[in-house]
Amino acid sequence: MFSKEYWLSSAKKSKSVKYLAIIACMIALKIAVGSVRIPVSENLRITVTYIVVALESTIVGPAAGMVSAFVTDNLSFILYPDGAYFPGYTLTAMLGSLIYSLCLYQKKITITRIAIAKTINNYLVNVAIGSLWSSMLYGNAYIVYATKSLVKNTILLPIEIVLSYMTLFTL
């Protein structure tokens, strides 16, 4: 997982026309799917973009996946601006892609691997880091955002794991 070859195999995919086309399609799909969301509160929304991110991370790996996450986040902001631009969210998208890649790239797809990736993403990325960004942007206490995000992510976690598994396993 942390070998030089592991990272190089992912980086090489960004130089292949075939994989560049896949990455471009995934970027377009993430933007389209991400534009459909259910608002929960001022900073919380429900989407199914995580399925596309997991799929892309499984195919292209960490290096290409993080570049794609960077491009997707910035294009999404240009096409669907929602408040002020904040680079922390770009880093969050890249970290989410990295976590999926480390758990799924060049590995057998299992419910356990998906559950680990989704749990880390939900609690570390969405709750811990996302709440920090919301607190910095909107000025309320960190605990206010963390509590709301914790409830939402805990409720959705089993559903997201099952949907991710059904999608990735059938492909």
Positions of predicted regions on the chain:
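Loop-helix junctions at membrane interfaces
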Residues: 1-171
